[in-house]
Structures are given as structure tokens and as C-alpha cells.
Amino acid sequence: MSTAAGTILTGKRRWFALIPVALGVAMIILDATVVNVVLPTLIKEVGLTTTDAEWVTAAYSLTFASLLIVAGRLADRFGRRLIFVIGLVVFVVSSVLVAMSDSPVSIIGARALQGVGAAMILPSSLSILNSVFVGKSRAAAFAVWGATIGGMAAMGPLVGGWLTTDFSWHWAFLINVPIGVVVLIGALVFVPETKDKASANGADVLGILFSTLGLLGVVFALIEGQRYGWVIATQEFTAGPITWSAGAISIVFVSLIVGVASLVALLFVERSRVASGKAVIFDLRLFKIRSFAAGNVVALVVSLGEFGLLFTLPLFLQSVRAYTALETGVILLALAVGSFVASGAGAAMAQRIGPVRVLQIGMALEALGIIGLGFAISTTVGGWGLVPWLFLYGLGVGFATAQLTGVILSETPVAQSGQASAMQSTSRQVGAAIGTAILGTTLLLGLGHFVNKDLQEAGVPSAQAEQITQVVASSAGQAIPGLGDPVIVEAASQGFSSATKTVSLVAAIFVTLGLLASFLLPRNAARIRAEGYEPPKG
């Protein structure tokens, strides 16, 4: 069956098309989480400084988040499979470049290039599914897509720990080569090309400029605000030939102002171009669709807390409980199992009670799982004490991720799938960046309070307790095992546990707010997608 935007596949072939799309998403999610495990080894073997290590992650996040909307629009205009394949090639080549790198600069540059590839893969993968699947099969495809994200986020530490421990850090990136080859062949053979044939009426150069600059500025500020100071620079910033001195107006503040101003300019430019009938990088009229507008609000809010768990829990397990990276990955597998179980049941449940209800059940399970983890965390808890709560959290992620994606895209025109997919991905990324900034600050403040308090209660002099607290906070707990004195180690571990509990409860509050926001969604969203639906005009 053909549509104006491409081909609706029927029979078994559509499920063959799902395989390379899901594997492509799995690859970028796996890579994003593997890096956290590999960083300590990179610091030792490549000579990365703490700042370099942070930029290995930040460079990827910046290019990824800032280019999602542009990549989504390019997919609609030039072909969703084409952009998916180009992104795949860029990602695999940059993975090889990371593995071959022998200096901080080359690693950071290659990671930034990886972000470019990932930004092309993610929105085009969703828009491919949205354009080639319809009805019940679309819900099932979204369920697989959502479970892939949740499962790979949990499996990343396990895979990274295994490859780094048994082989070398290079293989944590080289593993993308065989996966990429399989995905490339599958995409070329099974995935049909789809595009918006009505979009080829000029390039929105200003839209591309303002959207990229706006998201780059805002996301950079959110990532680096805690480190460099939100208004006044607390330390010198250096990036290649650029140096920003401490004591002056912070580069974070300037970046945030430029980013917000660019996004405001983007709104005016896009409204003007729509009124003139010209091509736009993003059609603002999509926000007149209730399921799309409310769904993006939910995506942003729930992402504030959804990924905070994967940020803090590995630190706790390795610093306080002294688990290895591989052992930590095994514990986190419970999350992946829960996510895959939920993906199998979610689509069928959505047909019976509606996707919005399944989404709300999922977010409720997420919140309960995080709260349970918050209360379970202690200096003596073992892996089995955390596994049930991780499994519950994984069930929630599996139910919520796919259903929210389906709801957001349920009433958007197939021809604008790339734009819509990119916006929901951007909402999640911006939410995750804000959440990481808030939860990171919460962790640091918690460490400063609880570690200092527990050390002094253990009889450590105030001045020494303050010094130890600074060491623990600056290392995000990694210095705890090396503190020596068992009394000090126990007190610092107790303080870190209390700080982690606080972070978990704050994350649960954010997920709960996302649950409350979900009641803004139309109850019948995404039950059956009507072909030929057109967005509201004007």
C-alpha cells in the first residue's frame, strides 16, 4: 500500500524492516551507556584529565541534541532510509576513529562526530516505523523500539565492563562495526525509502542555523552549568584555542542567553515562513495537535528523572558496595529484563485499555521502582536487594517509552514523521540534560551534607571531615575505597548512601510529575491511526 509519504508494508516484510531499525537504535543507545564504564580506563591509558573525561560525554551529547530537529527534517525531505543509512555510516566510521585515537583531542572530536551520526539515526528510525507501519502493527513496532532503548540502556554497562575487562577499551567502540554492517545490509534490503514529496520547496537556512545554535547553547549550559558557574565563571574554560577566564561572566551564562535568543528567533522565522508557504525546519502547527503537544510536555518532564537512576546507581554500586563494572552491569540487567517483558505485553494491553492508560501504568511503576530503590539503598544492601526494584522500574520503562512515542506520533501526518520524531527525541534529550543537572547538583549537595555529618558523628575532627568530604564529592565517590581507615570509609559510605537515596527520591518526584502531566493527553490517542490525517491549519 502506498501513501503520499511512502509505502505501508504488509505481511512479513514489514517485520524484517523492523529488525535493522531496532538494531540501529540499539547500537547508539548501547554506545552511549558503554562510555560510562570505559571512561576510567581511558583516563589511565590515554591520559585524559577530569575535564577531558567529561568532554568525552559532553561532546557527544551536544552534537546529538542540537542536530536532532535538523536531521528529522532532512529525513522527511530527502528520504528517511537515506538519512538513516548516512547516519549509520557516520556513526560506524566515527566509532573506528574513537578506537584508533591516542590523544584526548582526537577522542573528543570523534565522539562529537558520533553524536552527528546518532542524531541522524534516532529520528529517522522512528519516522521509518511511523511511515511503514499502521494500526496495531505500528503499536507493536513502537513497543519493540521502546524496549530496545530501555534494554540497551541497562545492558550497556554489562557489555562495556565485559569488553573492557576481557579485551580492551578499543572493543567497546569497535563492536559497532559488525553491528553497523548488519544494520546497513538490512536497511538497504528490507527498509523502503519514504519521504515527504511536498517538502522540496526551498531550504530553511535560518531555521537550521537558529535551531542548531539554540539547542547547542541551551544544552551546553545545562551540561556545564554546575562545573563552570551559572553566572560568574568559577573556573577557566578551555576548548582548543578558546580560553574563558575564571572570575568573568560565565561562558555558561553567555551560552544560555545565546541559546534562548536563537530559539526565540527560530519561532519568529518559522511562523513567517509558514505564513508565506515556504519550507520550514519545524512546522509549529504540529503543536496544535493535542496528543503531540501534551506528549512532548510529558516526555520532557518524565525525562527529568527517568535517567537519573542510571547516572547515580552505578556510582553507588562501585564506590560503596565495591562491585566491579561487570558486576554492576549484571545487576542492571534486571532493568533490561523488565523492559523486554513489558514490551511484549504493552501492545496487547494498549488495544484493550488504550495506550494512555498503559503509559500511565508504566510511569507509576517507574516511580514505585525508583522509590523502592531509594529505600533499599544502604551500605550493606546486596545486588539481590536491588534487583526486584530494578525489574519493576524496567517494566515501567518498557510500558511507558513505547506508548508515549506512539501517542506523540499518533495524529501527526506521516509526511511530517521526521519532524515529529525529532521533536519528541529533543524533548527527551533536553529533559534528560535538565534532570542530570538537577540530580547532579542534588548528589553533590547531598554528599557535602551527609558525608560531612556522618564523618563528624564517627569522631573525625571537623577540619579533616571537611577535607575528606571535598575529596569524596569531587570524585563522585570514587575515592571512598582508598580512604584507608575503616571508620572513615564506613562513614563516607553511609553519607554517599544517604545522598543517593535523596537523588532517587527527587528522580521519583519528577517521574510522578510526568505521570500527572499525562492526564493532559486525550484518552483515545493512538488507538487507530487514520491515514490521510492532516494537521490543523493556521
Predicted regions: what is each one?
Residues M1-V21, I249, L267-S272, K278, ...:
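Transmembrane-helix exit segments and adjacent C-terminal regions of multi-pass membrane proteins
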Residues S2-F190, A342, G346, I353, ...:
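Transmembrane-helix bundle of Major Facilitator Superfamily
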Residues K12-F64, L68, S168, F220, ...:
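Transmembrane core module of solute transporters
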Residues I19, L74, G79-V89, L97, ...:
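C-terminal module of multi-pass small-molecule transporters
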Residues V144-T148, A203-L206, V298, M423-S427:
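Hydrophobic alpha-helical segments of secondary membrane carriers
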Residues A147, G151-F167, L216, F220, ...:
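A gly/Pro-rich, aromatic-decorated transmembrane alpha-helix motif that marks the paired
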Residues T165-L174, G229-I251, T324, L445-A508:
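A membrane-interface helix-boundary motif in multi-pass transporters
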Residues T165-V297, A492-G495:
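Hydrophobic transmembrane-helix bundles of small-molecule transporters
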